[in-house]
Amino acid sequence: MTLNLCVLTPNRIIWDSEVKEIILSTNSGQIGVLPNHAPIATAVDIGILRIRLNGQWLMMAVMGGFARIGNNEITILVNDAEKGSDIDPQEAQRTLEIAEANLSKAEGKRQVIEANLALRRARTRVEAINVI
């Protein structure tokens, strides 16, 4: 038995295919979804979406949004998403270093919040590449 997974951003469809299982980062922690999962709607946090198909795991960096799960259908609408295999490791590492530097230079509450958010996004992209 499989799940139909659709990952969407405002600009494009990132993934639309059958999968065996997913592990999704939500605002209240990670959840695993197998076929016949109870219906839920949940907020998606910045983090890694793990997708299992044919015994292998695919990693995807997702940048927050919403998910609806029910009747073996999963629809995930996120601000942005990238497959780990599509991320340039050197560019991701540079972005992480810039985000860390910007956080250390941030002044005021708003700049600190924005810098922390940019750092979380950058770490997620690096993690999507390096996760085994």
From Swiss-Prot:
InterPro entries: ATP_synth_F1_dsu/esu, ATP_synth_F1_dsu/esu_N, ATP_synth_F1_esu_C, ATPsynth_dsu/esu_N. It is found in: Plastid, Chloroplast thylakoid membrane. One of its GO terms (molecular function) is proton-transporting ATP synthase activity, rotational mechanism. GO terms for cellular component: chloroplast thylakoid membrane; proton-transporting ATP synthase complex. It is a peripheral membrane protein. The keyword Thylakoid applies. It comes from the Eukaryota. Keywords: ATP synthesis, CF(1), Chloroplast, Hydrogen ion transport, Ion transport, Membrane, Plastid, Thylakoid, Transport. Belongs to the ATPase epsilon chain family. F-type ATPases have 2 components, CF(1) - the catalytic core - and CF(0) - the membrane proton channel. CF(1) has five subunits: alpha(3), beta(3), gamma(1), delta(1), epsilon(1). CF(0) has three main subunits: a, b and c. Produces ATP from ADP in the presence of a proton gradient across the membrane. This is ATP synthase epsilon chain, chloroplastic. It comes from Calycanthus floridus var. glaucus. The lineage of its organism: Eukaryota, Viridiplantae, Streptophyta, Embryophyta, Tracheophyta.
